[in-house]
């Protein structure tokens, strides 16, 4: 056998056919060497969502957000990106607040490491500036939720924004940026350069607890994929 590799992003399964293929012919530059301690099964449990979550955590670290900086909020916390972000942040020693619209996921989020859970309803309306609450944030939702998070950021805080589950609009003002020195850092996982990809996957091996792989995955056969795809949609 040849070298073990993994592939996420670059439009595969989106602009390029073959999402469920057992073999693929792709550009070598798209591939990442399988990091030591990872295998194909674990890599696909992590998937694009987990990889994106790791990039978000790295973005907060790059902005100087440390566990002692204060609480970090994760929106859309019960989704793939959000749940992995909660797990990673908890493992790294951060105090994590998880925002979820589904009460049925609260126990699951606590198991992953959320210190407290907030209802999505609390993020429906916002003012230009609100009480400072968060040192950092991972936002997967966008729209009013992201606007609320920005208004609640501590001075010098950073929001890693990677999703638009709630919409692509951003009804905010410049106030958090010019009065509180808040950083809004976009995070894209599709076109991430090779060096950053390799670093993120190596971090995932180190920073994701083994328990995550059993808590966050349901294994099915290939023939079951269409039925499960319908359920997800």
Residues of each region from the PLM?
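Glycine-rich phosphate-binding loop and adjacent beta-alpha segment
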Residues: 15, 144-211
């Amino acid at each position: 056998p040849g070298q073990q590799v993994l592939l996420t992003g670059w439009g595969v399964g989106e602009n390029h056919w073959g999402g469920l293929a057992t073999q693929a012919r792709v550009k070598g530059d798209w591939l990442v060497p399988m990091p030591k301690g990872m295998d194909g099964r674990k890599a696909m449990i992590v998937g694009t969502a987990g990889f994106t979550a790791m990039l978000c955590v790295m973005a907060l670290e790059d902005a100087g957000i440390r566990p002692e900086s204060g609480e970090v909020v994760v929106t859309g916390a019960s989704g793939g990106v959000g749940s992995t972000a909660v797990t990673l942040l908890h493992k790294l020693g951060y105090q994590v607040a998880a925002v979820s619209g589904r009460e049925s996921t609260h126990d699951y989020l606590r198991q992953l490491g959320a210190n407290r859970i907030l209802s999505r309803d609390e993020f429906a309306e916002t003012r230009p500036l609100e009480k400072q609450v968060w040192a950092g944030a991972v936002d997967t939702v966008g729209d009013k939720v992201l606007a609320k998070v920005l208004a609640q950021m501590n001075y010098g805080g950073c929001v890693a924004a990677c999703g638009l589950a709630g919409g692509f609009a951003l009804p905010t003002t410049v106030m958090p940026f010019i009065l509180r020195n808040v950083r809004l850092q976009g995070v894209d996982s599709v076109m991430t350069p090779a060096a950053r990809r390799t670093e993120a996957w190596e971090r995932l091996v180190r920073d994701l607890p083994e328990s995550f792989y059993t808590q966050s995955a349901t294994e099915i056969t290939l023939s079951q994929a269409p039925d499960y795809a319908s359920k997800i949609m």
